[in-house]
C-alpha cells in the first residue's frame, strides 16, 4: 500500500453543531485531530493557526460547515494539517 505523505480532504463539521453553541470551535478542532489520527495512524497532529482562524472567522460560536485541508507528513507519525487553498 502506498504511503500517504501529502493528502487533501474535506472535513464536514456537521457533528460539531450538536450541543452547546460556545463549544463548537473546540469540537471542530478535536474533530480534525481525530479524523487525521484515524485515517493516517498519527500519534501527533499539528494544526496550523491559519486553519483554526479560518474555521472561526465569524466568531467562536459561528463556525464554517466544511473545510478543505491538506495533510502533510513531517515526521514519524507526525502530521501537519493546513488549510488547502485552490490553485488557479
Swiss-Prot record:
GO molecular-function terms, A-Z: structural constituent of ribosome
Entry's Gene Ontology cellular component terms: ribonucleoprotein complex; ribosome
Family annotation (SMART domains): Ribosomal_L31e (SM01380)
GO terms of biological process kind: translation
Keyword Ribonucleoprotein: yes
Segments forming a coiled coil: none
Alphabetic keyword roster: Ribonucleoprotein, Ribosomal protein
Superkingdom field: Archaea
Family label: Belongs to the eukaryotic ribosomal protein eL31 family.
Database matches in NCBIfam families: PRK01192.1-1 (NF002258)
Protein name as catalogued: Large ribosomal subunit protein eL31
Organism in which the protein naturally occurs: Sulfurisphaera tokodaii (strain DSM 16993 / JCM 10545 / NBRC 100140 / 7)
Top-level taxonomy: Archaea, Thermoproteota, Thermoprotei, Sulfolobales, Sulfolobaceae
